[in-house]
Amino acid sequence: MNSDDSITWGELLRVCAAELGSEQEARWLCEHASGLQRGDFDAARDEVVSERCGIALRAMIARRLAGEPLQYVMKSWAFRHLDVMVDNRVLIPRPETEVVVQAAIDLANEMLRKSKPKLRVADLGTGSGVIGLSLASELPRGSTEVWLTDLSADALEVARANLAGSGLINSDVRIVQGSWFAALPSELKNSFDLIVSNPPYIGVYDPSVEVSVRNYEPHLALFAGSDGLDAYREIIAQAGEWLVTDGWLVLEIGHQQGDSVRELLAQNKFEQIEIRQDLAGRDRIAIAKI
């Protein structure tokens, strides 16, 4: 993309679409560089692009053409009802995780309907915070205390930024650092009604991992031992110490891990074990009661 002092946003959009091979990506990046939302951007198509906006857009196009994920280039992404900040300190939120969140919300609402006055929920390995913040924002206000944990201090900086941007800053959301349950105060054992996690679940030698994922996303959030099950082993083994009687565990799983995770849950005395599918019909969610 060459500099042109007289180029309009409409013309620049066409140039970017040709370079990227995607009109949708070009539009997102042009809107992001201009600082305009969709309707306002359409109204500004005949306006000349400022030098500052042109420089910013050229930098983003170069990063995208080098293979960097679009979400990191834009440093933002939509997840359910949230617009969140994302960068290479955290895993990119994916549509499959939205289905996991919905399963957790449905369970939480069912518990609230059964006259449970207030729920305590943990989002283990929160990353950008999208699971826990979605629960806090979509469940009735004041009904839920949500704990977000992560081993990575860098990831928690992103989660805190997303908490601040969510409008939930004065709500019952706690952000704590540590590995899985080690982040939580010991006095909270046997007090969580619901524990949710999207842990790393890719085997370190898995050849199917996309190049952009392996090159750009944090490996701590992706890989879990040779078979991808190490995080599940740890979480499932300890979850019973933290859940209340009849508490629920909800896990995002890899599409080929349903049987293995079911077996781990059964070995640790979980009941009502269910493996649910995502919108593509692949195993994606493990749900179980202690």
How should these model regions be labeled?
Residues 29, 67, 97, 131, ...:
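Residue-level signal for inorganic ion chemistry
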Residues 1-49:
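Non-catalytic accessory regions of SAM-dependent methyltransferases
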Residues 200-231:
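Mobile active-site "lid"/loop adjacent to the S-adenosyl-L-methionine
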Residues 28-107:
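Conserved AdoMet
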Residues 21, 140-141, 244:
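Short conserved AdoMet
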Residues 71, 202-205, 256:
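Active-site beta-alpha loop architecture of Rossmann-like, nucleotide-cofactor-dependent enzymes
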Residues 226-288:
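Conserved Class I SAM-dependent methyltransferase catalytic core
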Residues 99-208:
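Conserved SAM/SAH cofactor-binding pocket of Class I
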